[in-house]
Amino acid sequence: FYTDADRQFDIREIDLLLPLIKHYDIVSGFKIERKDSPIRLWMSWIYNAAMRVLFGVAVKDINCAFKLYRKEVLKQMNFLPNVTEGIINAEIFIFARQHHFTVTQVPVHHFPRQAGSPISEVGFLGGLTFINPRVIGRFIKDTVRIAKKVYW
């Protein structure tokens, strides 16, 4: 089981995922009624669209941090070294697609962040929020690395 520690999910909803792991290799949540900032929603849409177009990952919410994996899937993974946490989820779904692992998705409730802060955002100029340029650079770099692994 994988989830974040920022309390944006109700851990009791794992009961929605557990019965499905008997039939699927990966059970992935997708956020309903997202409680994220507009910039984060926009970034997520771009990210999911890019992974769908570039790698055929047809998952509603790749980075939803509420997932259940069969041990066999992760044991077979050959993760790229030093991949950022944001792209590792895509790498898992790309691997699953290539190796014909089964995936299903379950809607899970999403709550405002109660701890920590998103590294993908920087705030300045009177409270305006912008995308952290380092995050964009790492995303592009890691996407190219995954593309090389997949296509070359």
Can you say where each PLM-predicted feature lies in the sequence?
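Hydrophobic helical membrane-anchoring modules
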Residues: 81-152
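Acceptor/aglycone-binding surface of glycosyltransferases and processive sugar-polymer synthases
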Residues: 1, 8-86, 113-130, 134
